[in-house]
Amino acid sequence: VMKAKKIIIAIPTDFPPYGFVGTDLKPQGLDIDMANLIAQKLGVAIELAPVTSANRIPYLQTGKAALVISTLGKNPEREKVIDFTSAYSPFFQAVFAAKSMPITSFADLNGKSVGVTRGAIEDQELSRVAPTGAEIRRFEDNNATVAAFVSGQVQLIATGASVAGNMMARNPQLNAEYKLLLKDSPNFIGVAKGEDKLRLKVNEIIAEAKKAGELDRMAKRWLGRAAGDLPQ
């Protein structure tokens, strides 16, 4: 990378607010901000390579990209084929509602209606922790769940960070905010096996960005909450 003075970073363009194509047809989002930050700190030019969930790991394995910054969660299967840096951003399922609604614990959901997408991770987690007095209303897909919350059919919504970030950006009039965490599964940057020098350098950049508050700023800008403590 340093020799070529250029780094190719794989990013999502179909997953707002982490990665999407803006009105100017340029990729933008949290993952794109992170990619630009890394290239800037390495002092090299950047080439963004759009990937999907299916081809992002093959891009690393075949050397088409040096890094994958694409809402990548860490699990044992993936660790067999690629390496990971420290975590750089939160990815989470949570309960969101209007700022004016006082919700500080799951007990506060008593007597309230919560919209959720049937069978999604947040449905499973919510069913586990919600009090019996909460009315959980299930919808067939994320669009239907969001529509129910936006139109006021339900008072709260339980969904993933990306869906919520997108919803809040499109509907500022809702004045919605993050209320309760259901599940945390942070994002890591993927690096090809054997690229230890690059991996350690990126870890240094992540650690510095964390200390400088840059990771928190990025998460607040795109997800509505600070990055907080992320796993190494």
Model segments located where?
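Ligand-binding cleft/hinge of the Venus flytrap
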Residues: V21-G22, A35-V44, E122-E140, M168-P172, ...
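Short helix-initiation/N-cap motifs at beta->coil->alpha
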Residues: I32, E47-P58, R137-S151, K183-S185
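Extended ligand-binding regions for polar small-molecule ligands
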Residues: I32-K41, I103, A107, K112-S113, ...
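Alpha-to-beta junction loops
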Residues: I7-I8, G43-A45, V51, T62-S70, ...
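Immediate post-signal peptide segment of exported/extracytoplasmic ligand-binding proteins
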Residues: V1-K26, P102-I103, A107-S113, Q232
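Acidic, polar ligand-binding/catalytic clefts
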Residues: N36, Q40, A45-D108, Q173-L182
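Periplasmic-binding protein-like
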Residues: S89-A97, A161, G165-A207, R225-Q232
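Ligand-binding clefts/hinges and TM-proximal coupling segments of bilobed small-molecule sensing domains
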Residues: I121-R138, A176-Y178, A207-Q232
